[in-house]
A protein has these predicted regions:
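Active-site proximal beta-strand in glycosyltransferases
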Residues: 126, 140-159
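A short helix/loop element that forms part of the nucleotide-sugar donor recognition site in Leloir-type
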Residues: 213-227
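Conserved donor-binding/catalytic core segment of Leloir-type glycosyltransferases
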Residues: 41, 227-244, 249-253
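N-terminal subdomain of nucleotide-sugar transferases
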Residues: 1-78, 247, 251-257
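Membrane-proximal helix-turn-helix segments that form the acceptor-binding/catalytic region
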Residues: 114-118, 136, 151, 156-183
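A short, active-site helix/loop in glycosyltransferases that binds the activated sugar's phosphate group
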Residues: 175-202, 209-213, 352, 356-360
Length: 416
């Protein structure tokens, strides 16, 4: 529940002051607290499908801060909390901004689009740019309003994998950020090397939502797809592009134990031709979900009906997104974290820090090759791992664990 707060005044400096209503249990009557109006610039527009960013915004809102999100227009740009204000940028404008950000000499046109074309940005205390594009656009807003800038990095773009023009504006604007966020020590070091942001200014916050979702294994998927009750169900959620190894995984199905089946679910309900063909060839082994859920919570019904969550990452080096960024994914997989949040054991490949945790803490299995998966499944006991997955999420991944450090960084940025 988000508390309603009464504005009682403003002052220069750190945030503003409000008084909590005396009827709110757990707070001192008339207690005053500092709060901030924080603007997140998130051009990608998929807030509803980013479990970490959604959770962070929810937690900051519950803490009394006012949150505004500037994002590309679309159904997935909105936050489920009605108190989070979303400034929707028309698709045509957002696409143009992305094009211009790759040409530093033309970026003055991007600045004009941001400052003169709706939506107009209200006053704020601090801007958080999400990923490269959010940093570049957020810097324009922060500079125009004379407020500090922070950088939340989910993707790392390497100079060796993209053009100098593509990196130029990111490097320039990164020089003015008060702090940044990466997911683990390795990604923080790489982000520092690629942007020039000092490593000691980078917080470590894994990609994960907040709150475990324990539940007994349901028959949701069995009933949804007509899967026999004696089958164990592996689910593969998310993109099926080449870097996910989705196609080799499906091709390995004839070698799986007879009591295992695979369900694939794309976040937006997309189904490719090769998937339809595979379903036609293996109707009793391979099932496709064409549902599209407006929030991460909708996916939970599917995860509670599965026995295993599969997440595979294989760098293809054909775009700046799918090279070293994928090779060093570490603790930045929201898919793996979401599986564990729902008590679902995981099957992953060699991904750095998260793979070590899975091995050492008994959270599932780690494979070096898709062809090893059938052998792993013959001896896999998911029920013994569910509790450990929930505990690991609660103790290491939950976004609320990192809220105190984040709030200190926000307060320091605004105060200096």
């Amino acid at each position: 529940m988000v508390l309603t707060l009464l504005y009682v005044g403003r002052r220069e400096g750190l945030g503003h002051e409000r008084t909590r209503p005396t009827t709110n249990a757990g707070y001192e009557p008339g207690a005053r607290e500092k709060w901030m109006r924080i603007l997140f610039v998130h051009p990608e527009g998929n807030l509803a499908n980013n479990p970490n960013l959604s959770a962070i915004i929810e937690l900051l809102t519950r803490s009394g801060h006012e949150i505004i999100v500037r994002s590309a227009r679309g159904n997935f740009a909105r936050h489920e909390n009605p108190n989070v204000r979303v400034l929707e940028v028309r698709y045509r404008i957002q696409r143009k901004l992305m094009q211009l950000s790759c040409h530093p000499r033309k970026w003055f046109l991007g600045k004009l689009l941001i400052t003169l074309v709706p939506p107009m940005t209200p006053p704020a205390d601090l801007v958080v740019g999400v990923d490269r594009q959010g940093l570049i656009e957020g810097a324009v807003i922060a500079r125009s309003k004379g407020i500090p800038l922070a950088y939340w990095s989910y993707e790392i773009f390497f100079a060796t994998e993209c053009s100098s023009d593509f990196k130029a504006l990111e490097r320039r604007e990164a020089s003015s950020v008060r702090f940044a966020v990466a997911q683990d020590d390795l990604r923080a070091r790489l982000l520092s090397e690629e942007t020039g942001i000092p490593n000691d200014r980078i917080l470590r916050i894994p990609v994960a939502g907040t709150g475990t979702r324990p539940a007994a294994r349901t028959r949701y998927l069995n009933e949804r797809f007509g899967i026999p009750a004696d089958r164990r169900i592996a689910i593969f959620a998310g993109s099926v592009d080449e870097w996910t190894l989705a196609r080799p995984l499906v091709e390995s199905l004839p070698l799986w134990p007879e009591n295992w089946v695979l369900v694939m679910h794309h976040r937006y309900g997309y189904v490719s031709d090769w998937q339809r063909s595979a379903r036609h060839r293996m109707p009793s082994r391979f099932y496709l979900s064409e549902d599209s859920f407006p929030t991460i919570e909708g996916l939970g019904h599917m995860l509670h009906g599965a026995d295993l969550g599969i997440a595979l990452y294989n760098p293809t080096y054909d775009t700046p997104w799918t090279g070293r960024n994928i090779a060093n994914i570490g603790m930045s997989s929201g898919k793996i974290a979401t599986y564990m949040q729902y008590g679902l054991p995981v099957l992953i490949n060699e991904l750095g820090e998260i793979s070590s945790h899975v091995r050492e803490k008994g959270l599932g299995a780690v494979t070096g090759d898709v062809l090893e998966i059938p052998g792993i499944l013959y001896h896999f006991d998911p029920e013994s791992m569910r509790g450990r997955c929930l505990a690991f999420f609660a103790e290491h991944l939950d976004a609320k664990l990192y809220l105190p450090d984040l709030q200190r960084a926000l307060s320091t940025a605004v105060a200096t």
